[in-house]
Amino acid sequence: IDKNNIKLYRGSLNNVYLRYKKLINENNCDYFIRICADSPLIEVNIINQILKIAKKNKFQKEIYTNIFPRTFPKGLSVEMINTNTFLKSYKKIRLNYHKEHITSYFYKNYMYFKILNYKSVVDYSDINFSIDTKNDFNKVKRLIKIKGFLKKKLKEKVNIYKSI
């Protein structure tokens, strides 16, 4: 980690929201992008599209996402959240579920937040590129071993996923 100049932060095990809150307070940013560790196949072009949409929108929304509703495969989730919105909401969050799943509060209370969703042209919401189980891990491992898989377009990746 030091060799590659990557910052590592560890915080509360049970209160992920608090972990993010402390990290945000240590860094000066207007937005942060949330990508979960169980998503090793994340697509950089999805991140870039969300950034492009936010810029075109002049950063008027509080959350830019591709999961509300989900149209991309599970495991390709990207959420860009306004830090002020995130920090102000902390006092309102009572349920431990929302403290562990840090954006669930915003989606449950979507009517109070400005959310913009980036939709896939094709609905791939039934595809799972996420690693939540040993079976998921083994499937992703098989996918990664396929020559050139990581450089393929999403449609090709989905077709390969369906074939194994």
What name fits each language-model region?
Residues 96, 146-152:
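Cytochrome P450 catalytic domain signature, combining two hallmark sequence patches
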Residues 2-55:
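Short phosphate-binding loop-to-helix
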